[in-house]
Amino acid sequence: MKYMTINNQKVAFDDEKNVLSVIRKAGINLLTFCYHSELSTYGACRMCVVEDDRGKIFASCSEVPRDGMVIYTNTPKLQHHRKMILELMLSAHCRECTTCKKNGDCTLQNLAKQLGVSYIRFENNKPQIPIDESSDCIVIDKNKCILCGDCVRTCEEIQGLGILDFAYRGSKMQVMPAFDRKMAETACVGCGQCRVVCPTGAITIKHNIHPVWEALADKNTRVVVQIAPAVRVAVGDKFGIPKGENSLGKLVAALRRMGFDEIYDTDFGADLTIMEESKEFLERVESGEKLPLFTSCCPAWVKFCEQKYPELRANISTCRSPQQMFGAVLKEEARNNKKDTRKTVVVSIMPCTAKKAEILRPEHKTEGEQDVDFVLTTTEVIRMIKEAGIDLAQMPWEAMDMPFGLSSGAGVIFGVSGGVTEAVLRRLVEDSGMEALNEIKFTGIRGTDGIKEAVIPYGDRQIKIAVVSGLKNADELIQKIKSGEVQYDFVEVMACRRGCMAGGGQPVPIGARTKAARYEGLYRIDDASQIKRSNDNPIVGELYEGLLKGKEHKLLHNNSDLPQAK
């Protein structure tokens, strides 16, 4: 064991990759702008500087820890340096904090408060840059950018897209797409991971809050809302509820008090997806055509595939995502309801920014009407709850509305990478006993690895499965599939690392502990669920015998003849 001295305290360390990790291990929250453990070390912000016993100052994020090292994290010299850095950042920053979407969650704002920066000596002489609102998913405001490079590295190193990069030099430097294009003109898939790591309000979610409030205020409108699996373990983050705790019942109570007429669970839509996708998969296995079957639940992945690998479009499942299946069912139910003549508006609460673009795709209209009208991210619904003056933590636990409030544990785990695959396997396995279901857990599809593989016996053959999260990982896997290096029958893809629970619309920050808590929280809900398999959900069976009879393809599948999103 090796030791170093931090602020006169002896601290043991082992395989930490930098001094900053040892400092945080010692319980000192040395905040940074540009450091993320999953990204390459950049060392640009200099907020993590420390001083050694000889008076030398260096960035702790880029320094390898050494046995016997002596450092200090809060000397007068360091305090002066950090305050000066913050002043310079703030001098070139738009300081309209009260109207900023990031107000309260802004790292720059929080650090200024923490370090006592109450006066800026330097004027902001930078010209105002137009805000880019062309994307359906995110908003870019370069006036609030501090050039930390987090979005650049995330887009390149995690997603493999490289949409954003640095341009120009010196005081004119900016982060932008190539040739200063609008985001809507780029190959951006709307995953929102750049927004997750942005420490300021330079990249934010494109809000749909106002039109939803308008719909709720209209007495001639019936507002129906569906809640995605990953939302329930994240929405409590900003209300003092422990991370990863299931807050679904409290959220239902809050939404009722906000005026939503009917509240349902997207897990029910996931149950429908499992029924259709497992059927489609078996048909392809038997025919041997269009394999591997790629999942279609993640709109960011679907758009990525269409743009980079259009030749694989036929391999993507024709099944709509749970959001779109459920939206189509809700609208069809409304069309058949002659008693309620009000206009029906379907709202989705999602962990994902790409879902905002998904609802606008041409194939997601039925009889000329959008299946889902508005998407609110978890972050947006948190803001709406606070606008309504509701304390989520104090809400009673209330149940979903029926009949679409009943769902299986298989639907819940759609919120984690590997969950879709496990849900499909539960549907396919003939033995519905707990022992058989528990065996599925240990096939290799659970866990946080970016690429997971499993071989599952089915009948007289072996089914080869891959589970991948993060588009860069997906790209690498597809290259191996195309080259013949690997071969699979079923491939689950999610654009966001570890799945929807770390989606671009979730409350930030999303560190390793937060991800672990949400991951474990979703599996705890599944463990407590009395219905483990989608085909055991009685409401699903009733729906197939009733509303869906003869309409399965129309409402639950995409029409491949329609033009695809570009």
Model regions: which residues?
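Extreme N-terminal starter segment of soluble prokaryotic enzymes
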Residues: 1-2
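Short strand-turn-strand beta-turns centered on an Asx-Gly dipeptide
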Residues: 6-9, 53-54
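A short N-terminal beta-strand-loop micro-motif at the entrance of redox/enzyme domains
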Residues: 9-15
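Iron-sulfur-associated redox domains of electron-transfer enzymes in respiratory
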Residues: 15-68, 74-80, 206-566
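Fe-S ferredoxin-like electron-transfer domains
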Residues: 46-190, 203-217, 222
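Mobile "lid/hinge" segments at catalytic clefts and subdomain interfaces of large enzymes
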Residues: 162, 195, 381-385
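Charged, low-complexity hinge/linker segments at coiled-coil and domain boundaries
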Residues: 197-203
